[in-house]
Amino acid sequence: MNPQELKSILSEGLLSFPLTDFDVAGDFRADTYAKRLEWLAPYGASALFAAGGTGEFFSLQASEYSEIIKVAVDTCRGEVPILAGTGGPTRQAIAYAQEAERLGAAGVLLLPHYLTEASQEGLVSHVEQVCKSVDFGVVVYNRNVCRLNADSLEKLADRCPNLIGFKDGVGDIESMVSIRRRLGERLTYLGGLPTAEVYAAAYKAMGVPVYSSAVFNFIPKTAMDFYRAVASEDHETVGKLIDDFFLPYLDIRNRCEGYGVSIVKAGARLVGHDAGPVRAPLTDLLPNEMEQLDALIKKLGAQ
């Protein structure tokens, strides 16, 4: 798949990031990971991002990364495109991106480089080096220490034909509008704030109708229903799901740092698709929080 074909796919529909399955010892569990992908693929997501943030990319070893991407690509071939997460130091991000390309992924999501602050010039150099190390499409994730402005993205768009997308996990409306207006149709734009459904209607109004859903991992039907409601401007359905599910869900998620991933694994466990524990430094939900989440999920009905 060439970068422009991938860009077209990512320009509409719902996206998601499968959890990474671990056993009780914290080791990658390939068989249930494959079954997870087989379960999720038919629900209609435009693309799935393997070993992304929700997939605990930041906790994976290189050998595990290769196995995860291979399982994802092999399992979903002909069903749904797989993009791989990559990130960290520039040379590591390059190595992972090249490995993902070798294994047949359709593209990569470039996560932040972590820890150190960087100038716009440094961020441009980092992203440019990753883009030029591969032929397939690259989506850059604006989040944490990687906050590219419109000037920097314009430079990258000119220098890197395979930079096809910009995912926003910052939520700076002025910056997002500036980037969207400046870059126009050169990139595809993805909403990427945690629990993106809460912000979906606002991002759609800015010209960013596509977003990634974490809750797709355990309530895929509801996630797709919500996306369609936003797309069709069914404000009644959007408001009801936000009030009945997403705001109470946020109340649980916001109780502890790192729960953005933990609560998704908890949800998967509750619906019978257990992905195992999160890896340290993340922590799993407490028993009473599991009960509260279970009650929210049951109100939604069958998935």
From Swiss-Prot:
Under catalytic activity, the entry for this protein gives:
5-dehydro-4-deoxy-D-glucarate + H(+) = 2,5-dioxopentanoate + CO2 + H2O
This protein's pathway: Carbohydrate acid metabolism; D-glucarate degradation; 2,5-dioxopentanoate from D-glucarate: step 2/2
Record's keyword annotation contains Lyase: yes
Among the Pfam families in the record, one is DHDPS
Q: What is its EC number?
A: 4.2.1.41
Q: What SUPFAM superfamilies does the record point to?
A: Aldolase
GO molecular function annotation: 4-hydroxy-tetrahydrodipicolinate synthase activity; 5-dehydro-4-deoxyglucarate dehydratase activity
Q: Which UniProt keywords apply?
A: Lyase
Biological process GO annotation list?
D-glucarate catabolic process
Q: Which domain of life is it from?
A: Bacteria
Enzyme class, broadest EC rank: lyase
Under InterPro entries, the record lists: Aldolase_TIM, DapA-like, Dehydro-deoxyglucarate_dehyd
What the record says about family reads:
Belongs to the DapA family.
From the Swiss-Prot or TrEMBL record, give the protein name: 5-dehydro-4-deoxyglucarate dehydratase
Q: Which organism is it from?
A: Pseudomonas putida
